[in-house]
């Protein structure tokens, strides 16, 4: 009802928990909604985080290089392989940094386990990462994360004995026997 009375053009809202993105066809309607949202939240003693909210021109006809972060992804305008407009998604820098720090900490905490056990547990973590972030347009990001994990695993296992017996060549031979989960795209459509 609220939408029909105040807004005449297309409007969409994507919401997850306490995060949401509102999409408007016209900028003036987005600005009006933003003001109404601030007033509405004020009635309940809440306020909007000014540093996390903004109105930005985005879409097929705007031709901007603007991007925004939502749910761990950076969303940006692009063209598909066929030259058609699409919105592509890549892992946001902030989330990627957090994931890297977490996996590095985990590897150092588990450096004294056997390499086979570590890889088995690590593959579960990698699969979860790929299933969430494995969408069309983000394959390079998945590869970078895979290479980072592979490198950190090698460093942690080398550090374990402090004799550095585990050369890169030996390590790659171990990975042939106990392979790390390789990146995979799970959602292939570009929308």
Please name every model-derived segment.
Residues 3-191:
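Non-catalytic terminal/accessory segments
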